[in-house]
Each structure stands twice: as structure tokens, then as C-alpha cells.
Amino acid sequence: KRTDYPGKEIAIKTQYAWDQQFNSTINVVFGNEWYAGNLSYHLKSRPVWEGMIQRDKLDELKDYMCLDNICVGSR
């Protein structure tokens, strides 16, 4: 069930991995609207969902990383 989805835990792991690699703030997420939106909700910076993952969108970012089926980044 979606009520059992571990969104908070995924956000904590994502933020930790991000902080190990970058000093910037996560301000965008890409991927499936439900999964990426859930991640956005649980991240402190509340990044904006900008649609499905596309290479050209990622190339415009200063920093980015992809975990499973979601990418997060910083402009």
C-alpha cells in the first residue's frame, strides 16, 4: 500500500548521499510524479518536480545524482 511507502527513509538516505558529494541544495527532482513528488515532500528543501528524467534536463544542472528511478539536482 502507498501508506506503507517509506518516503521519509528514502529522503533521509537521498539527502545523506547528496551531502557526501555536494555542498549545494537539492532544488529539483525528476522521475515518476508519485515517487519524485513523495521524495520532494519529505526533503527539507522541498525541491520542485520538473517531470520525467531526461538527459538534456540533467545536463543543465550544476549538480545531480540519480538513485533508482529518481534524480535530484541543483541549478
Language-model features and meaning:
Residues 2-75:
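Luminal/periplasmic acceptor-recognition loop/helix of membrane-associated glycosyltransferases
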